[in-house]
Amino acid sequence: MKIAIITGANSGLGYASTQALLNEGYYIYMACRSEEKAVEAINSFDLQFRDKVEYVHCDLSSFDSIRACADHILKNEKQLNALMLNAGLMATPPGETKEGYEMQIGVNVLGHALLADLLLPLIKTTPDARVICLSSV
């Protein structure tokens, strides 16, 4: 079974991508900030898919949360076929990440860069693995 991680998988393009990859036979890790929203999304999938999707907490504004997410994947998987870097913020009120970076840059760029870097060893050992980055401009 192919394995994918999708950030921001509980809504929008992340949710649609989760549905599409479930239909293709993937096991999906929904890397989301809100467990409540992720569980709501999981419960909306057909019953046949609910055992092929798992919520994993990933707050992209916190390097500690990103590291914990990556550690969970690295401890539980021997391959990673797709990493979809989808989550993002736009037009947010002024604020900073836990590490002191401007929130939008911290989440949309630095958080995803750290997650990809931490998962790169697993991606590199998986034949035909893909990293997909989504962005709005």
Please report, for each region that a protein language model flagged, where it lies by residue:
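Rossmann-fold scaffold of SDR-type NAD(P)-dependent oxidoreductases
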Residues: 7, 80-88, 133-136
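Conserved glycine-rich cofactor-binding loop
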Residues: 8-12
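Conserved glycine-rich Rossmann-like NAD(P)H-binding loop of the short-chain dehydrogenase/reductase
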Residues: 24-40
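The beta1-alpha1 cofactor-binding region of Rossmann-like NAD(H)/NADP(H)-dependent oxidoreductases
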Residues: 35, 56-71
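A glycine-rich helix->loop->beta "capping" turn
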Residues: 49-53, 72-85, 91-96
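A short helix-coil junction within the Rossmann-fold of NAD(P)-dependent oxidoreductases
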Residues: 76-77, 93-95, 118-127
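Short alpha-helical oligomerization interface
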Residues: 92-106
